[in-house]
Amino acid sequence: MTKKRHLFTSESVTEGHPDKICDQISDSILDAILAKDANARVACETTVTTGLVLVAGEITTSTYVDIPKIVRETIQGIGYTRAKYGFDAETCAVLTSIDEQSADIAMGVDQALEAREGQMTDAEIEAIGAGDQGLMFGFACNETQELMPLPISLAHKLARRLTEVRKDDTLSYLRPDGKTQVTVEYDENGKPVRVDTIVISTQHHPDVTWEEIDRDLKEHVIKAVVPAELMDGETKFFINPTGRFVIGGPQGDAGLTGRKIIVDTYGGYARHGGGAFSGKDATKVDRSAAYAARYVAKNIVAAGLADKAEVQLAYAIGVAQPVSISVDTLGTGKVSEDVLVELVRNNFDLRPAGIIKMLDLRRPIYKQTAAYGHFGRTDVDLTWERTDKAATLKEQAGL
């Protein structure tokens, strides 16, 4: 069956979006704890609304961190520093409700999970079960240099650029909240050929005109990010299409940790298991196994074994080995998917403790992932973005 030209859309949000504020607070708390106690168990959820931050969750640690201080520093770093923005780091109320991890959950995970993954025997790694059941997906494709789908790649770059021009005062009238969306046209062979539509909504000072925002964003944001050859006379631009976006951030919408899971991953281009990332330490397979699945998929594509690869992992609580591993190359594989699954089993340790060891996940590295995507990042060195297994996979596949 001949494929038709089609459109695909992905969105991103800035670090000042209410849900992303929550992700960054949760991961800032996680990082602060991991910096002092690498073996801490953290499941930290945040919600924000007008003038209020609530931090709740289960944390088991030997250290102390000043959660209200971390919350205020995070909000200040994002740029909510004045009451007229509708949310202010100094004056917002911060409530906390923290318990320890359930003993029933800990029983299935504990065994030998100390800071000695480097010296652990295979039997000890095998003894450490997953912290929950669940399924996780990882994806990679050769549409971009970072092996990510083009729509989400461009949406993230636009969102990041919105923040840059706000913080460096290029467009000093911008305020922290904002969203971007990119629609890409694909040809009959499934290759991206042009950008069809760009949508940007950004919070702004009440006195700036829509015409000024429209002109400035096209010049300083879109032109700076989207390659000229991808845009043409038919490309459509919707800049603040409601005409006004003054009330934003937590004053405009309540926010919650883990509510931007598609923004965090592949923009809807690949499937998602449903688990969120932020605020969770690496014993939570929602996070660590999703990172591992991306690592596997990226190395498969980097090795030239497929143009696209979607990897699914699934776990049972308290059990170390994945209950299933599957690879779907969407018809682009150079070897069979059975061969790819065998290569994955032979070259990647996908047990929870094995993932932590393989990707070195007991470090305070998570706040930097909490805005602009966890995958395809070129601005920070993330272990799951490395392609150090590609040569081995290619050789073992006989290519």
UniProtKB/Swiss-Prot annotation:
Gene Ontology cellular component terms for the protein in this record: cytoplasm
Compartments reported by the entry: Cytoplasm
Primary role: Catalyzes the formation of S-adenosylmethionine (AdoMet) from methionine and ATP. The overall synthetic reaction is composed of two sequential steps, AdoMet formation and the subsequent tripolyphosphate hydrolysis which occurs prior to release of AdoMet from the enzyme.
Binding positions (Mg(2+)): D19
Name of the featured protein: S-adenosylmethionine synthase
InterPro entries from the UniProt entry: ADOMET_SYNTHASE_CS, S-AdoMet_synt_C, S-AdoMet_synt_central, S-AdoMet_synt_N, S-AdoMet_synthetase, S-AdoMet_synthetase_sfam
Keyword Metal-binding: yes
Region Flexible loop, annotated ranges: 101-111
EC supergroup of this enzyme: transferase
